[in-house]
Amino acid sequence: MSEESGRRNLRMPSDDEMFAVVVEHNGGNHVRVRCQDGENRMGRIPGRMKYRTWINEGDVVLVEPWAWQDEKANIEWRYSEQDAEQLRTEGHIK
């Protein structure tokens, strides 16, 4: 983080990833997300994140849609509120 601006270097999506917002928590390790391309997908929370990173409605996440089933995606990263605000001010998400 730079001292004068307060800007942090954040994880940005790779070629097959995109930003999404959690719309609904369906229980277990599944959430409904609204992706940056306008699609609603079923997001799967992987085991490495399940108990360490709590994902709630309204959270900004990074998802990777499945190649063989486009209506589903894996959640790869959850951004904190400060990180999500930085992404909004820089114009990466709406």
Swiss-Prot record:
Q: Which GO terms describe its molecular function?
A: RNA binding; translation initiation factor activity
Q: Which UniProt keywords apply?
A: Initiation factor, Protein biosynthesis
Q: Report any Pfam family annotated for this entry.
A: eIF-1a
Look up keyword Protein biosynthesis and say if it applies: yes
Ranges where the S1-like domain occurs: 6-80
Reading the lineage from the top rank, the first entry is Archaea
Which InterPro entries does the UniProt entry name for this protein? NA-bd_OB-fold, RNA-binding_domain_S1_IF1, TIF_eIF-1A, TIF_eIF-1A_CS
| Role according to the record | Seems to be required for maximal rate of protein biosynthesis. Enhances ribosome dissociation into subunits and stabilizes the binding of the initiator Met-tRNA(I) to 40 S ribosomal subunits.
Which HAMAP family does this chain map to? aIF_1A
Which family is it part of?
A: Belongs to the eIF-1A family.
**What name goes with this protein?**
Translation initiation factor 1A 2
